[in-house]
Amino acid sequence: MAAYYLAVDIGASSGRHIIGHMENGKMVLEEIYRFENGMVKKDGELCWEFDRLFKEVVNGLKKCKEIGKIPVSMGVDTWGVDFVLLDKNDNVLGNTVGYRDHRTEGMDKEVYKAISLKDLYARTGIQKADYNTIYQLMAVKKKHPEYLEQAETLLHVPDYFHFLLTGQKTCEYTEATTGQLVSPITKDWDYELIDMLGYPRKMFQKLIMPGTGIGHLSDKIREEVGFDLEVVAPATHDTGSAVLAVPANDDDFIYISSGTWSLMGIERKEADCSEKSCEMNFTNEGGYAGRFRYLKNIMGLWMIQSVRHEVNDAYSFAEICAMAEEAKDFPSRVDANDECFLSPDNMTEEVKDYCRRTGQKVPETLGEIATVIYTSLAECYAKTAKELEEMTGRTYSRIHIVGGGSNARYLNELTAKATKKEIHAGPGEATAIGNITAQMLKAEEFKTIEEARTIIHESFGVKVYK
């Protein structure tokens, strides 16, 4: 009988439990549980509801029991940078504030009193983003110093869920690298940097690599769900898992992990922490097997998701794509990476305001708004592809788009046209596939990453756009 492996993939807007197993030499997936996610306002801050989310994680485990498909292992992946601080009794200190909150405004200047941006990049290789853990911790230090005094443990979001499942405190490497406090040379916390910033060393747990067994379910959770399994750390940063699932074994490609964010880059064995790389705002995030994801964060489908939400989700993404195609000659463009689009009160109005401010024609219909966003994204991809080629001194023949955005046919066509490269779209469930793949590699269902990626290609295929 085939062994089942469970990926709990929690994104910014929803979470899913997806079970995978091998059947006739192919990987087969089944989504068994889904739940909503999103930040809520609490005490004037944008916060995650981690207590509710963890109940949903447990509910999905109960669903496994209910349908009689009990996994041998499971792993949780989420977005990057966010964390909890625990006191000596393992209680959460303060609100579980999310990365879109404005508490980090001005915190970069506080960090640069201890270390310059240039030196920080040389040490960590991580691109500057105001929501990185390093700046969030500075916000805690400035606004709630008592939390840092009381904190015994820092856990990133997936590590926190693994702790609630097992009672074991770990910090997984790929997630930790997103926070800008890890050395790409030692692949460990940069304790000297941590000391310079005045963050307590004792909070930072030992880093573990993806594929490491964390432990079995605690007695309490085991009794609640009715079975036991091993919790295995995947690449807990969702992009790290998605990149593991890119169905290619050569190195002649750029990938885009396309979802709420678009993460566009290449895999490499060494980090590039040069001044030029810093100026170009590339980042060196940790990947599976000690590889680096050399990439750029691009706003991604967040903009179109927000616009859809503002019309009360009255249209599917496919319908919005069709409207965009009808308005394809609309001439205006926006900078998809402008921070004004990170957390606006109203995305539709923000796009209009941007066009107005820059002296362009202002979009009025939903189709016009959508075509501005999609075309701007495709042009941003083309610009980033050129920058990657400039930084690496080589050209790439194709772009692999994985994740939910790989299903956006119109955007894929625009990207092929803008980049003049072949687009290989799929698999859409790349993050869950990568999560399950890390578990299967540990269980020796696959001997190597290369074998796993070959099977992923055979199992899910790709759609080619030229």
Where are these regions (language model features)?
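N-terminal glycine/serine-rich phosphate-binding loop of ATP-dependent small-molecule kinases
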Residues: 1-94, 122, 150, 222-231, ...
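Short acidic-aromatic active-site loops that bind/stabilize oxyanions
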Residues: 46-54, 126, 130, 207-211, ...
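Short glycine-rich phosphate-binding loop at a beta-alpha junction
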Residues: 70-78, 153, 206, 394-403
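Short beta-strand-loop/turn "lid" adjacent to the catalytic site in phosphate-handling enzymes
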Residues: 66-98, 127-131, 162-183, 206-209
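Conserved phosphate-binding loops in N-terminal lobes of ATP-dependent enzymes
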Residues: 59-72, 130, 137-138, 145, ...
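Glycine-rich beta-strand-to-loop/alpha-helix junction loops that act as flexible
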Residues: 77-81, 210-211, 258-261, 398-406
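Carbohydrate-associated surface elements
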Residues: 101
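Active-site core segments that coordinate phosphate-bearing ligands/cofactors
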Residues: 6-7, 19, 112-125, 135-156, ...
